Structures are given as C-alpha cells and as structure tokens.
C-alpha cells in the first residue's frame, strides 16, 4: 500500500506539470475539453507505467498545453524509462519522439530515428518525409 502522503505529493506534482492544479476539486461539467484531456493524461501516468499508449494526446489541446503535456511525457520516458507508443498526425508532436514509423496505406513506409539530432532538425526531417509521401495522407506513429 502506498502512503497517503506519497499519493498526495504525486497528484500535486503531476497536476502542476499538466497545469490542472486549479481544477482538482471541480466536477467534470465544470472543466473544458482540454482540461479533461490533461486529466486523462494524469490518470494514465499517475502509477508510473512502463508502457504508455497515447492516441493523439494533444488533439484537443492548445499549443501551450500541448507543449506542457509533451514535455511531461518526455520526462516520463527519460526518468522512468517508460516505453511510449504515440499515434499522431502532427509533425510537431512527433518531433518529441526518439523513433518514428510513418504509415501509408496501412503499411510502414519509412522509419526515422532522432539520434543526436536536435528536436528542430528532427522536425525538419519529419516534414521532409511527410512532403515525400503526400503530407496529410499518412499517419505518424
């Protein structure tokens, strides 16, 4: 059993990282769609999972909230050595990954690995692949 003090500390830490501290005592009908999405992410990461499945995790978020969420997911990956399988159509979101599989017509079209590239350089490579395969017609995983 986890001590209550430890649970409370973890909740406050994650809520702070996802900018949802001010809604912890609110009912679902009192919060926005983006806040609900960030709460769902908090639920997914609260127990330090070894595998995190993220399907369009930034879909309902504004750019600031998206960046905060992606930074949190990235720190989970680094600190907990968690594997994160993320599906996204957004090149910026994909640039936070270390490895990307591009799907086209239900098959793997290409793989990119970040390696030692900066996120900005990796983002440019992602855009180049998307241009090569027709932009929005593919999925980035």
Range-by-range predicted roles:
Residues 107-132:
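Conserved beta-strand-loop-alpha-helix hinge in the C-terminal portion
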């Amino acid at each position: 059993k986890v001590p209550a003090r430890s649970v409370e500390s973890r909740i406050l830490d994650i809520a702070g990282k996802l900018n949802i501290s001010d809604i912890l005592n609110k009912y679902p009908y009192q919060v926005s769609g983006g806040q609900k999405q960030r709460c769902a992410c908090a639920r997914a990461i609260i127990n330090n999972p070894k595998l995190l499945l993220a399907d369009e995790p930034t879909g309902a978020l504004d750019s600031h909230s998206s960046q905060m969420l992606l930074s949190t997911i990235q720190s989970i990956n680094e600190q907990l050595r968690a594997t994160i399988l993320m599906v996204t159509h957004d090149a910026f979101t994909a640039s936070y990954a270390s490895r990307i599989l591009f799907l086209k017509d239900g098959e793997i079209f290409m793989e990119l690995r970040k390696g030692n590239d900066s996120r900005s350089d990796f983002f440019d490579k992602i855009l180049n692949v998307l241009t090569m395969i027709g932009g929005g017609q593919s999925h980035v995983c």
